[in-house]
Amino acid sequence: KNPALIKKHKNNYLELGQSAAKDFLASIKKVLIKDSKIHFDRFTSEDRHIHKKSFTKKALAIFEKSGLMYKKDGALWFKTTQFGDDKDRVFVTKDGFPTYFLADAGHYLETKKRGFDQKINIFGPDHYGYVKRIQAAAEIMGVKNSKIIITQAVRLIKRGQEVKMSKRKGEFVAFGDLVAEVGVDVARFFFLMHSPETHMDFDLELAKERSMKNPVYYVQYAAVRCSGILNKANRKSQIAKRKIDFSLLNTTEDINLMRMLARFSEIVDEAAKNYNPQILVRYSMDLAREFNNFYEKERVI
């Protein structure tokens, strides 16, 4: 709380803050949904869906029944050290305001009430210290299947040099600007090539290059070749499937491509079970490599 701001704006400071947050969220949604073509089933408002529906109060009541709460310096604390945390955490400040920790516990309850038995939390690289308390909240709220993903920083490489950024100084490149420069397909593909839990270098020059060095162009080129074969086959081929001699598919390139294609269902299943689209992206690159090898050494039509 900033006393000077409260005095200046009197009772309007909360409304002003909410209005600014609403505008900021709208700009983020535009980048994510319209510009980046990312679909969200639902957006949750912490104010409307968590606080105003009393999920923080319900979470607090559950914590109080756990016997792991205590008062200190006018604040309400939770014994997160019993869950491996390095220190206990404040739940409610001495001014009576709930902390992010309590709000996150409320999120668990709200998710559980909507019928979900699993919650995946995605944090930035500066939130390692938050893991133990979130795991504690999940356990107390009765959500047994809780996963935490710590994303890593992305370095932007331009002309072989790292573009220096600083959150403290407000120096950064927004994802929307990146999409505008390289295109949405390339931006999405480059990010999905890497696990969110590993560091990533985004090579701006490579992303804009239209050659086989660019993995996006490489995969798209294979797709165009596939389409060309299928189009010609539909126009010219009158051979019935039952008359095809599959024994002719016996070269190294034939066999490698067929083996890769046979893995498709397994790859989709693995990506779904691990919540990891990177597996599909890597597979598309491997499949493109095998297909291009096949295409360059075998006359198809």
Annotate the PLM regions.
Residues 1-301:
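Non-catalytic interaction-recognition regions
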